[in-house]
């Protein structure tokens, strides 16, 4: 089953376990976020949204897009302006598509335990001794 959600002024077609990059969403890696603005679920089209439909997702990482250069030049005036912009993005993994006001499963509701320290740092410390 698929759904169409709206976030950050854009619409995304999503299905369970999809990994997508969206405009910045508040939350850290491992947090669960819910999207209530569901425009379509399967063959059900909302007017404007599907009542009682929620899409849950897990935040995988917070990041930034590639730099976009905005260059303006005024001809014959020796005048130019260069500015750069990097959009903040959030990578999310779609957990569930819920309809009819269903609650998220316990698996989606639980937060993941923090990861252990990287092994590379421990290996460097041992080789230095």
From Swiss-Prot:
The keyword Ribosomal protein applies. This is Large ribosomal subunit protein bL21. Keywords: Ribonucleoprotein, Ribosomal protein, RNA-binding, rRNA-binding. It comes from the Bacteria. It holds the Pfam family Ribosomal_L21p. PANTHER family: 50S RIBOSOMAL PROTEIN L21 (PTHR21349), LARGE RIBOSOMAL SUBUNIT PROTEIN BL21M (PTHR21349:SF0). GO terms for biological process: translation. The keyword rRNA-binding applies. GO terms for cellular component: cytoplasm; ribonucleoprotein complex; ribosome. It comes from Brucella anthropi (strain ATCC 49188 / DSM 6882 / CCUG 24695 / JCM 21032 / LMG 3331 / NBRC 15819 / NCTC 12168 / Alc 37) (Ochrobactrum anthropi). This protein binds to 23S rRNA in the presence of protein L20. The gene is rplU. InterPro entries: bL21-like, bL21-like_sf, Ribosomal_bL21.
